[in-house]
């Protein structure tokens, strides 16, 4: 990937520099848009219901309120023009709610929504939209200062707030999520399988949402399949706020999905990996425009990963790590398979990434019909990264401290009690404003054009950008450094 900077390009404000806004730069400015380009509110409705008064929910106990909410949704959706449901102030418990067409939910500002305990070990979502049925014209919005989704006391780590599938013309807005380091992004903009093809969301707005205490590898939103969506005013503490990482294996099998015509504005990260991430994996994605990105004590503000090809051993064959590597190289050539890693099936299924060389990737495309993913035109305007000491960092990123932090100061390793898979994540100083690990010389590269990037309070010898040409070497003892205190781990 090649990062483009107009006029000066990453001035460190700590050293007294200053940058003009992207509008002042002159040559390039963001596309304009209006809300109605993404979501159109209803002009006529048949009913207005209250969840407590009309359907008997109780916001003052610990009982499951899912049945009452589902009955209300069903009743509204049966009306030709649908209607609005008010969730009045109180504490409610929901799980597995199926949203339907023409239902518009409004939630008062003192509402607390908690997950109903299930305990079956499966993945759970509070609300599913267009997963099992087509949904058209839907909204779920907080009133006033917004409501709270509270996961803090839940023992269920397999939770998400929303999963979106085949939904069109929708708006989700105005609430806070108190997470408990669950192992999903809180809003999954996903795909769903029906009648031999995949379906995904089109025409929507997701905005005014803050997430606290997210797990490093997840965060607020992940997009798999989406067309014409506006993401606005989003903030994730921990992980990634807007993770455009299109890695759903259903999409790989169908060769369908991906994201196109995406707009984002005011995307923020604190104490996490990044505010915005591009990770195409194996999908050909379309155009993306992002404006006003900021990070405080994050690894970076913007992160871009290369697309790649990954080959899985067949489920009906038994392989070792070495035998699957040899099988791939017998098709693609020596040196074209990286070391495989286990992917289930009793420890006998393996995945091997194809080496990031055009000759190897060309053979993989010819042999398997798969090539690295990419994006279309990507422009990111007005990026501000503020240095801090509590960023989420991946193990391979620690090597970039070779010039800026060679003693690996203030980097800690979570204890096994905090995170059992030691070596996956660390907490330490911010690295750069932009991290770009895509190959510059490959024809499978994609470009991110970035305008007006600022760094605040970064040390003098820190990196401006990190890319494939950045010097790196191992300076941290990956497993011998100090343990993270509970205050650093728990935010």
Swiss-Prot record:
InterPro entries: Pectin_lyas_fold (IPR012334), Pectin_lyase_fold/virulence (IPR011050), RHGA/B-epi-like_pectate_lyase (IPR024535). Keywords: Carbohydrate metabolism, Cell wall biogenesis/degradation, Disulfide bond, Glycosidase, Hydrolase, Polysaccharide degradation, Secreted, Signal. It is found in: Secreted. One of its GO terms (biological process) is cell wall organization. Its EC number is 3.2.1.157. One of its GO terms (cellular component) is extracellular region. It catalyses: Endohydrolysis of 1,4-beta-D-linkages between D-galactose 4-sulfate and 3,6-anhydro-D-galactose-2-sulfate in iota-carrageenans. Disulfide bonds join 269-298, 336-360, 408-476, 412-484. Residues 1-23 form the signal peptide. It comes from the Bacteria. Its main location: secreted. GO terms for molecular function: iota-carrageenase activity. Hydrolyzes iota-carrageenans, sulfated 1,3-alpha-1,4-beta galactans from red algal cell walls, with an inversion of anomeric configuration. Also active against hybrid iota-/nu-carrageenan, not active against kappa- or lambda-carrageenans. Belongs to the glycosyl hydrolase 82 family. This is Iota-carrageenase. It comes from Alteromonas macleodii. The lineage of its organism: Bacteria, Pseudomonadati, Pseudomonadota, Gammaproteobacteria, Alteromonadales. The gene is cgiA.
């Amino acid at each position: 990937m090649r990062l483009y900077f107009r006029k000066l390009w990453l001035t460190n404000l700590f050293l007294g520099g200053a940058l003009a806004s992207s509008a002042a730069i002159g040559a390039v400015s963001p596309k304009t848009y209006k809300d109605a380009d993404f979501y159109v509110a209803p002009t006529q409705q048949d009913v207005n219901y209250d969840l407590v008064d009309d359907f008997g929910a109780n916001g003052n106990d610990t009982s499951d309120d899912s049945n009452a909410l589902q009955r209300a949704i069903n009743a509204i959706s049966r009306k030709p023009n649908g209607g609005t449901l008010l969730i009045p102030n109180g504490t409610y418990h929901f799980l597995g709610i199926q949203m339907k067409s023409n239902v518009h939910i409004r939630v008062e500002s003192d509402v607390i929504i908690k997950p109903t305990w299930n305990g079956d070990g499966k993945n759970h979502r509070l609300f599913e939209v267009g997963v099992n049925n087509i949904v058209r014209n839907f909204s779920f919005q907080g009133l006033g200062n917004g409501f709270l989704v509270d996961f803090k006391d839940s023992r269920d780590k397999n939770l998400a707030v929303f999963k979106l599938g085949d939904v069109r013309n929708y708006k989700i807005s105005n609430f806070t999520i108190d997470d408990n380091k669950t192992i999903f992004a809180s809003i999954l903009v996903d795909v769903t399988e029906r009648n031999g093809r995949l379906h995904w969301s089109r025409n929507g707005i997701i905005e005014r949402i803050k997430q606290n205490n997210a797990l490093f590898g997840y965060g607020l939103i992940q997009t798999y399949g989406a067309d014409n969506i506006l993401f606005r005013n989003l903030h994730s503490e921990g992980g990634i706020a807007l993770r455009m990482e299109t890695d759903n294996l259903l999409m790989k099998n169908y060769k369908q999905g991906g994201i196109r015509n995406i707009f984002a504005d005011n995307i923020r990260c604190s104490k996490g990996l990044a505010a915005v991430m591009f990770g195409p994996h194996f999908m050909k994605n379309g155009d993306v425009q992002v404006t006003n990105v900021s990070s405080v004590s994050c690894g970076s503000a913007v992160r871009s990963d290369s697309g790649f090809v990954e080959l899985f051993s067949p489920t009906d064959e038994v392989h070792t790590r070495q035998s699957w590597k040899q099988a791939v190289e017998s098709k693609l050539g020596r040196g074209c398979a990286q070391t495989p890693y286990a992917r289930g099936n009793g420890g006998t299924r393996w995945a091997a990434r194809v080496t990031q060389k055009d000759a190897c990737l060309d053979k993989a495309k010819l042999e398997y019909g798969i090539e690295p993913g990419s994006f279309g035109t990507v422009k990111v305007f007005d990026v501000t990264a503020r240095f801090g000491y509590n960023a989420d960092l991946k193990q391979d990123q620690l090597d970039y401290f070779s010039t800026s932090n060679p003693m690996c100061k203030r980097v800690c390793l979570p204890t096994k009690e905090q995170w059992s898979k030691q070596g996956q994540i660390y907490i330490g100083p911010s690295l750069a404003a932009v991290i770009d690990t895509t190959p510059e010389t490959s024809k499978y590269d994609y470009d991110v054009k970035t305008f007006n990037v600022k760094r605040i309070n970064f040390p003098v010898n820190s990196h401006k950008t990190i890319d494939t040409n950045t010097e790196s070497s191992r300076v941290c003892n990956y497993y011998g450094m100090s343990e993270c205190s509970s205050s650093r781990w728990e935010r």
